[in-house]
Amino acid sequence: MDQNLKIYSILEKNSVSRETCIEFEHFISMIIENNKKINLISRGDEQNIRERHIIDCAQAFDFIDLNSNICIDLGSGNGMPGIILAIMMKNMELPIKFNLYEKSYHKSKFLESVSKKLNLNT
């Protein structure tokens, strides 16, 4: 686990806490667990999900208007970037709600489950 947390050091400029990184890891385990059933990411990306998906999505934080109270993720699919950014906002105690829109029933249910398990403002 500690080795995985070191990968997130690139996000220090965004004040990403250890707790946030641990929640990223919980999210990753949910993606991998559900990936076999609903194809959330390519099988090849499971090994490098942190670098290829999580860190990329977290860098979008710089483009969010922190004075807004809503952020929208259209075509949320596997929850990236919406879930990643919602995790960051929660741990920074910023009151921005993330509206996640996904047309696939199974992916929508996955997003609902993740949001509840991680207690996100979505």
Question: Predicted segments — roles?
Answer:
Residues 58-122:
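Conserved SAM/SAH cofactor-binding pocket of Class I
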